[in-house]
Amino acid sequence: MKVDQKGHTVIIRDTQGDFTSFLMKVTQQYKTFEKHNIIIDLLMHNDLSTNDIKLFMPLSKQHKKAKKSFVIVTSDFDYNAVPAKLTVVPSLLEAHDIIEMEEIERDLGF
């Protein structure tokens, strides 16, 4: 697991290739990142199912309650199959754009 920080955003990238252990590590170390916007980079995983992505739902809910953004990045995926409560995008650039827009919305009181 590799963690990069850019301003108020933390990018968490899986370096092992084992989705289950990555999810466990992110969950266990969540307190370390809870004060930042989070981008979960799953670009190295080409075989993720909708159910795999849904496993991040509890973390996403908790994070959004704290008024922070939680974005998952993965490619080759049916983005319409994911619940609206989860934010899933195809690129890191798009993830940063979403976080920027959500920050503006929070600043405006939405």
Question: PLM ranges: what are they?
Answer:
Residues 1-28, 44:
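STAS-typified acidic loop motif
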Residues 1-9, 19, 74-110:
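STAS-like cytosolic regulatory interaction modules
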Residues 4-6, 31-35, 63-65:
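Flexible, charged surface loops at secondary-structure boundaries
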Residues 8-10, 35-40, 67-71:
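Hydrophobic beta-strand segments of well-ordered beta-sheets in folded domains
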Residues 23-53:
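Short, glycine-/small-residue-enriched flexible loop/hinge segments at domain edges that mediate gating
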Residues 41-46, 68-74, 100-105:
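Short C-terminal domain-edge/linker segments immediately following a structured domain
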Residues 54-58:
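Alpha-helical scaffolding segments of alpha/beta enzyme cores, especially the outer helices
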Residues 60-82:
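Short aromatic-glycine-(Arg/Gly/Cys) micro-motifs in beta-strand/loop hairpins
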